[in-house]
Curated annotation (Swiss-Prot):
<dbReference type="GO" id="GO:0005886">
    <property type="term" value="C:plasma membrane"/>
</dbReference>
<keyword id="KW-0472">Membrane</keyword>
<dbReference type="GO" id="GO:0006605">
    <property type="term" value="P:protein targeting"/>
</dbReference>
<keyword id="KW-0812">Transmembrane</keyword>
<protein>
    <recommendedName>
        <fullName>Protein translocase subunit SecF</fullName>
    </recommendedName>
</protein>
<dbReference type="GO" id="GO:0015450">
    <property type="term" value="F:protein-transporting ATPase activity"/>
</dbReference>
<comment type="similarity">
    <text>Belongs to the SecD/SecF family. SecF subfamily.</text>
</comment>
<dbReference type="InterPro" id="IPR005665">
    <property type="entry name" value="SecF_bac"/>
</dbReference>
<feature type="transmembrane region" description="Helical">
    <location>
        <begin position="159"/>
        <end position="179"/>
    </location>
</feature>
<dbReference type="GO" id="GO:0043952">
    <property type="term" value="P:protein transport by the Sec complex"/>
</dbReference>
<dbReference type="InterPro" id="IPR022813">
    <property type="entry name" value="SecD/SecF_arch_bac"/>
</dbReference>
<feature type="transmembrane region" description="Helical">
    <location>
        <begin position="19"/>
        <end position="39"/>
    </location>
</feature>
<dbReference type="InterPro" id="IPR022645">
    <property type="entry name" value="SecD/SecF_bac"/>
</dbReference>
<keyword id="KW-1133">Transmembrane helix</keyword>
<dbReference type="GO" id="GO:0065002">
    <property type="term" value="P:intracellular protein transmembrane transport"/>
</dbReference>
<keyword id="KW-0997">Cell inner membrane</keyword>
<feature type="transmembrane region" description="Helical">
    <location>
        <begin position="264"/>
        <end position="284"/>
    </location>
</feature>
Length: 321
């Protein structure tokens, strides 16, 4: 297969500490943004009124949104029923007022409809959904660590990958806090999807590193890591670019419903590609070069040597006590 990107020989590890610093600065800024601005929680988490409306004529979701857009609603369609659920944030005391406002707006837009039901989703339900979302994210990270550790026979690979995933997830959440985009269950789904994309990128590079270690056991681990990153760079960039093109198209032409989903996916793919090259793999190198267990697993010359030096230092310390 022809590489669209010429063969490269970048020294990724030489500049890794600069990118550690860049990530640290961005993450601190993101934390400050989350603490000061907070997340713009959607009705799924904050609570609000849900008005189910059935129209007598065929109507698109954009027409419904246009009629009630001043209330900043979330709108869900029911396939084949010409029925829509209009969700608007607010307290329980405002349920009747919200229903009346929706009816007035739809009537003003000259739409023929019937209000089927009106319900209120309280903050307790929103809290429960939030806890479930956190559990989903936490469990996905745990299983990813276990899977990578099992596949590569060492916990270092899995832990490095998950550190990068936490980095990516935090960056995406911080970006939404900064932009004050609505954070709901759709965004949680997009978050998990982006995390899955990122770990796949990491596994591709980790697998190449493992193969290069087996084929060249006497080669410096430093060189193996750099070579593996360069050998997979074309695949990483082309795959990321292809996904980005699709997401940009969805963002601009997919309608209002998919706008926030595609936006957080865009952020996730960009940050995920960055963390794969400059965070996850360098962490494996920095951690592995001082690990006895890793040296036994991969049998690489300079990793094993680092482990022997580390053991010798421990022995000398005990001897001089």
């Amino acid at each position: 297969m022809m590489n669209l990107i010429p063969k490269t020989n970048f020294d990724f590890l030489k500049i890794r500490k600069y990118f550690y610093a860049v990530s640290a600065i961005i993450l601190i800024a993101g934390l400050i943004c989350i603490l000061t601005r907070g997340l713009n929680m959607g009705i799924d988490f904050k609570g609000g009124t849900m008005v189910q409306v059935q129209f007598t004529e065929s109507i698109t979701i954009d027409q419904v949104r246009s009629a009630v857009e001043k209330y900043n609603p979330e709108i869900q369609s029911y396939v084949g029923k010409n029925t829509y659920m209009i969700k608007i944030k607010g307290s329980q005391e405002n349920v009747n007022e919200v229903r009346s406002d929706v009816e007035t707006s739809l009537t003003a837009a000259k739409l023929k409809f019937t209000v089927v039901a009106t319900d209120f989703v309280g903050p307790t339900v929103g809290k429960d959904l939030g806890e479930r979302a956190l559990w989903a994210l936490a469990l996905s990270l745990v299983f990813m660590v276990l899977y990578i550790a099992f596949r590569f026979q060492n916990i270092i690979w899995g832990t490095a990958g998950v550190i990068a995933l936490i980095h990516d997830a935090f960056f995406m959440v911080a970006a939404f806090a900064f932009l004050q985009k609505e954070f709901d269950l759709v965004i949680v789904a997009a978050l998990l999807t982006a995390v899955g994309y990122s770990i796949n990128d990491n596994i591709v590079i980790f697998d190449r590193m493992r193969e290069n270690i087996k084929e060249n056991p006497k080669e410096s681990f430093y060189n193996i890591v750099n070579r593996s990153l360069n050998e997979t760079l074309s695949r990483t960039v082309i795959t990321g670019s292809t996904v980005l093109i699709v997401l940009v198209i969805i963002y601009f032409f997919g309608g209002e419903v998919l706008k926030n989903f595609s936006l957080i996916m865009l952020i996730g793919v960009i940050v995920g590609t960055y963390s794969t090259l400059f965070i996850a793999t360098p962490i494996v190198y920095d951690w592995a070069k001082d690990s006895d267990n890793f040296a036994k697993t991969v049998g690489n010359q300079d990793v094993a040597l680092a482990a022997e030096i580390k053991t010798a230092k421990k022995h000398n310390k005990k001897k001089h006590r």
